[in-house]
Design a protein with these regions (language model features):
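Small-residue-enriched hydrophobic alpha-helices in membranes
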Residues: 1-162
Length: 162
């Protein structure tokens, strides 16, 4: 997928909602995001906004540095269990699935990491299957959206006068 103006329609973290998440929850989420971004050993343009989101939500410079280094080295960050912010755990998982879908492909390494993260979130294994089904559909819908918006560029306007 080429980098285009489609970025105006991408999903991002909303700063006002981040204020409700504990620092521990933000660190966990940022580490999970970075791990998903690099598990396939590449960082494409469509994923860079998520990397920025992950870095910017962290106030601790040492942890920010750890995340930046892990991207540079393409090494997954150690991720423990999410014990705080349980009310947001489902939202975190869907956000991580959107990170997987950002480049328009779902790779085996990403599937394996999402399965692992499911356990770290304390969810039953079938939750991972539901999320993977959803992310597969999201990738298909994003491709369909891209095809439609591409075809709409070539349509000459037809205005109906009243």
């Amino acid at each position: 997928m080429d980098e285009t103006i489609n970025s105006i329609a991408e999903y991002r973290l909303i700063p006002e909602y981040l204020e409700k998440i504990s620092e521990e929850g933000k660190i966990w989420l940022a580490r999970a995001m970075v791990s998903i971004l690099i598990v396939d050993k590449q960082l494409v343009n469509e994923e860079k906004g998520f990397f920025k989101d992950a870095i910017m939500m962290i106030e601790n410079d040492e942890i920010r540095g750890e995340l930046i280094e892990s991207i540079k080295k393409r090494e997954i960050v150690e991720l423990g269990e999410l014990t705080t912010d349980r009310e947001y755990a489902g939202h975190f998982y869907f956000l991580l699935a959107m990170v997987v879908a950002a480049d328009g492909k779902v790779k085996n390494s990403e599937v394996n990491l999402l399965n692992s993260i499911c356990g770290k979130l304390g969810f039953p294994a079938e939750t991972s299957k539901q999320i993977l089904n959803w992310v597969t559909n999201l990738v298909k819908l994003n491709k369909e959206r891209d095809n439609i918006t591409e075809s709409l560029k070539d349509i000459k306007p037809v205005f109906v006068l009243k």
